[in-house]
Amino acid sequence: MADGHSNNNHVPVLLSFSAFSRPSSVPVGSGYEVLIQKFLSLYGRQIDLHRKFMIQLYSDEWAQYIDLPKGFIISEKCKLRFVPLETDVTILGNLIPATTVFFCCDMQERFRPAIKYFGDIISVGQRLLQGARILGIPVIVSEQYPKGLGNTVQEMDLTGARLVFPKTKFSMVLPEAEAALAELPGVRSVVLFGVETHVCIQQTALDLLARGFEVHMVADSTSSRSMMDRMFALDRMARTGIIVTTSESILLQLVGDKEHPKFKEIQNIIKASAPESGLLSKV
């Protein structure tokens, strides 16, 4: 089907960016993520990905563009535009427990022989899970095709996890996770760790970023089969505005003060340094 024409499954849309406007079509029921990808496919070379953007919908009632309503999905012919925010947004990376959620991605038994330094990233991941329980931070856990790849490794204690769900898609940003996030309306920061860095982690991070979340990628709790894949994925994520950090930095930022009532418990977690695994020094 040519762009600009509709059938039973697609509707025509006019997509505008800067001085350009192009007719296209999208499937009925398309939401924010599909529209973002459509804009990027049409105007990717002109869009500065270091800036923050928003989608606006043309309103016949108001005869002007308005911010895309929350939960908007395409149901009929419409006009949309992709506009930068007035100023570049500096990502400060501040973390507080009340607005933070942890995403633990696919730390499963069948990956153990293949993933570089798997034992070390599990050890660090367990620290993060323990810290989340102490600080009352929700944890969302995914398992990639558990029927074939097994469940989350036994070393990682998922007690109190808000959601543990199976998936086949690489990204964790699926209806189950989005529903859990919708029940946490104050959350703006996601701390992400797991495997593989260049596949499920990267796709999850980019999907979260597209939805307006501030993403903190825990470098000492993520790895891949190939260290080169891992290295380039971390570099790409950092360039798109994802904060690449470490587990100790995350935990201490969340308490923020030695007078915090939970500081001693967090201190006990990090007394022994995280494993010097070679994740940084070896490609």
UniProtKB/Swiss-Prot annotation:
Alphabetized CDD domains for the sequence: YcaC_related
SUPFAM superfamilies from the UniProt entry: Isochorismatase-like hydrolases (SSF52499)
Pfam family, one: Isochorismatase
Highest taxon listed in the record's lineage: Eukaryota
Disulfide bonds: none
Transmembrane segments: none
InterPro entries associated with the record: Isochorismatase-like_dom (IPR000868), Isochorismatase-like_sf (IPR036380), Isochorismatase_domain (IPR050993)
Coiled-coil parts of chain: none
Family: Belongs to the isochorismatase family.
PANTHER family, per the entry: HYDROLASE, ISOCHORISMATASE DOMAIN-CONTAINING PROTEIN 1
Name of this protein: Isochorismatase domain-containing protein 1
Source organism of this protein record: Salmo salar (Atlantic salmon)
